[in-house]
């Protein structure tokens, strides 16, 4: 859990902004959205596999684009 200590003479909105930023860096909101509803293990594996395939395709396309460029 991110903790933000409010400094002396610091406006509330600045402290709130720092807290939101630390929550975003910690990934709390995305974790809450992910856990909002139960997801079957097969669905989790299927989604992870699809993400891995997408990353691999993106990597290959970047490598091919690098080879094609002939300056």
Swiss-Prot record:
Record-level GO BP terms: translation
Compositional bias segments (type: Basic residues): 43-59
Assigned keywords, A-Z: Ribonucleoprotein, Ribosomal protein
Keyword Ribonucleoprotein: yes
Gene Ontology CC terms: ribonucleoprotein complex; ribosome
Transmembrane domains' residue ranges: none
Pfam families: Ribosomal_S21
Region span, Disordered: 38-71
Source species, domain of life: Bacteria
PROSITE patterns in UniProt: RIBOSOMAL_S21
Bias (Basic and acidic residues) ranges: 60-71
NCBIfam families from the UniProt entry: S21p (TIGR00030)
Protein family according to the UniProt entry: Belongs to the bacterial ribosomal protein bS21 family.
Protein's name according to its UniProt entry: Small ribosomal subunit protein bS21
Gene: rpsU
